[in-house]
Amino acid sequence: MRNVLLPLAMALLVASNPAMAAVGEPAVSDPDIKPRSPTVPVITDDTGLFETFGGREWLVKIMDDVMPRWIKNPRTRPFFENSDHERIKRQLVEQFCVIMKGPCEYSGRSMAEVHRGMNVNEGAFFALTEELQITLNARGVPCAAQNRLIAAIAPMHRDIIDR
């Protein structure tokens, strides 16, 4: 578990420090990660990562598995208790699919707009990411694939954290 969370922590640290990460740019120096927009960066022009994750069907299963974890975790529960879980899962599937260059379109709002006023703190953001990685591990997603996804979504940290 430690060797999975260390790259995550590093990516999030870089993403959360403006001196270390350019605004709108990926948190790591991976030439395959290309930002498409502040809402949905695209990892690569190759669909290999999308296929490694098992395509849209597996993204749906991952979201079905992780949502109860977010609701149960005391650090993330307040942000999910009174929300439309099905809509959130659907939009996260779309977002992750686009990030991984799958055949999807993201229909949601920007991360800054969605999270404005929610008072999401770093502890909640990190807990959400930890629960996602636990779920990805349980689903057998290879560590390298997890790290590429986490590195691509880490810059969204700036748009989600309020305090």
Locate predicted features:
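Positively charged n-region of N-terminal signal peptides that target proteins for export
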Residues: 1-4
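Core of compact, soluble alpha-helical bundle domains
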Residues: 21-163
